[in-house]
Design a protein with these regions (language model features):
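Conserved P-loop
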Residues: 1-77
Length: 156
């Protein structure tokens, strides 16, 4: 998930790694965005301020996901980064905004010296099979379950 990927980015930034993050479906002004910019981590953010209807994504949702995927392919191809994080990309696959095969191709053609990190709530088996490391963070209990709103500095 995003939290673990950002922890890795923080650690790598401490060792002067060059890091890029492509946010699929995330353009809100989260607190971590401000910190990442201060650390010199390059952010490429795509999406809208509207929630996506997984059953009926809008044409804008498809266009934004396409642009995010094109940026991901460019970053991997150019090889200028040590780490590229594709945040919420597996959710974009699950919503059928981008093709699973396109992400598989990206994994199979990445340079050996690039750490390519994918995040999202679900992960297709085809990606798990090709990954070197797979982690799962399961929500057991959350304040949302009590109807509490997201809190500045905690959830965003």
């Amino acid at each position: 998930m995003t939290t673990a990927a950002l922890g890795l980015a923080l650690r790598a930034a401490g060792h002067n790694f060059k890091i890029a993050i492509v946010h699929f479906m995330k353009i809100w002004d989260y607190g971590e965005v401000k910190t990442l910019k201060r650390l010199g981590i390059d952010l490429f953010r795509y999406g809208t301020t509207e929630l996506i209807d997984p059953e009926n994504p809008s044409p804008v949702d498809f266009e934004q996901a396409k642009l995010a995927m094109e940026k991901a392919e460019e970053l991997v191809r150019e090889g200028a980064y040590d780490i590229v994080i594709l945040d919420e990309i597996t959710v974009a696959i699950g919503f059928n905004l981008i093709s699973l095969q396109g992400v598989v191709d990206l994994l199979e053609n990445k340079p050996d010296n690039l750490e390519l990190i994918l995040t999202g709530r679900t992960c297709p088996e085809a990606l798990i099979e090709r990954a070197d490391l797979v982690s799962r963070i399961d929500e057991i209990k959350h304040p949302y379950q009590k109807g509490l709103q997201a809190r500045k500095g905690i959830e965003f």
